[in-house]
């Protein structure tokens, strides 16, 4: 009986966690082209890296690393269709180690290679599949 938290506390705590995660999402968006380590993100959030991962997954619905990879692929896909940058330059810009690792992830998410995606007219519609739903 005494170990249960009042519902109002639980709700406020969840709202607080959601606001922290929202701030982290904004920070990540501004840093997608930079190296992002779990330690850096945890330090920015004020959480330990283990707690951050647990809260992030609870609120966003996917692991932090997966979220970052998806966001990078989304932004890279937009650049493939809106710029003339070479695939390797886009891959490196979004912190992929090589064009091959970028192409492998890209194809895993969108079912098509970056080069073919650039030539296709599917555009941003496919990117909606990658957008996470924040709770």
Swiss-Prot record:
It comes from the Bacteria. Residues 22-120 form the HTH araC/xylS-type domain. One of its GO terms (molecular function) is DNA-binding transcription factor activity. Keywords: Activator, DNA-binding, Transcription, Transcription regulation. InterPro entries: Homeodomain-like_sf, HTH_AraC, HTH_AraC-typ_CS, MarA-like, Tscrpt_reg_AraC-type_HTH. SMART domains: HTH_ARAC (SM00342). Residues 39-60, 87-110 bind DNA. Transcriptional activator of 2'-N-acetyltransferase. This is HTH-type transcriptional activator AarP. The gene is aarP.
